[in-house]
Amino acid sequence: QIALESKRFGISKWWIIFGLAINLSKDKKKPVLDILDSFSSVVQKFIKIIMYYAPIGLSCYFASLVGSFGKELVLGYAKTFLIYLIACLFIYFVIYSLYAIICGGKNGFTNYWKNIIPPSVCAMSTCSSAASMPINIESAKKMGVTEDVSSVSISLGTNFHKDGSIVGSVFKIMFLVQLFNSNTSTFKIILIALLATILVSAVPIGGGTISETLIITMLGFPLSTLPILTIIATIIDAPATVLNVTGNTISSVI
């Protein structure tokens, strides 16, 4: 394990030095950057192909898990989704409404709910914060938020402010901890959830998988448990996206 960590650290140092060397090469760095850009595009296509067939593999793995753990696993997933949905509904209806009242009083509350439905529906149907961004910015403007504030806060929030994802990370950690009867403190659960959400939020493709891998690694579980978290991510995707999108809207209002 020590040798493996040392090797990873050495590779990281090599790529940092390589990046600095490219940056210092000025005009001659363009061919290298073009090669790296092309390689990045190929890798992204490769990941897309894998993710296209991933549902088949996940279905087979889920069937295997049910065979091993029995109905308790299915009940665990159902319970996780139900509790997560209740938490999302509480934040969506109660917490965000309180923010709207604090910011604008009764008129702010009315104006908020008059315009928040379109981005919510878009988020629910697309499961994509990026796809919901244009209609989200437009809704924020109708709430009285200036275009400068709404465009900047919502654009940044799409990458770095994800209420639904953070809550989802907490539930993923709690599910694993209960499944394997592991003792983990509340502080550690919250810390890992924040790191798993914020540190990989700018990753354009495969960010969710990286987040789940980070959770597993920090908890000390084997990578074979990754599909377990992937299934949770799939079933909570829609409500999580709604919370991510509307959280950015109320942030721009604030």
For the regions a language model picked out, list residue spans one by one.
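Membrane-water interface of transmembrane alpha-helices in multipass transporters/channels
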Residues: 71-79, 106-114, 182-190, 221-228
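Helix-loop-helix junctions within the multi-pass membrane cores of secondary transporters/permeases
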Residues: 118-197
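Signature of multi-pass transmembrane helix bundles
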Residues: 1-111
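Transmembrane alpha-helical segments of multi-pass membrane transport proteins and ion-pumping complexes
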Residues: 11-15, 20, 24, 53-56, ...
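Transmembrane alpha-helical segments and their short flanking loops
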Residues: 170-254
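Loop-to-transmembrane-helix entry motif
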Residues: 6-7, 39-53, 77-85, 116, ...
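Small-residue-enriched core segments of transmembrane alpha-helices in multipass membrane transport
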Residues: 40, 78-95, 113-120, 187-200, ...
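Juxtamembrane helix-boundary/capping and inter-helix hinge elements in multi-pass membrane proteins
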Residues: 25-30, 38, 69, 105-108, ...
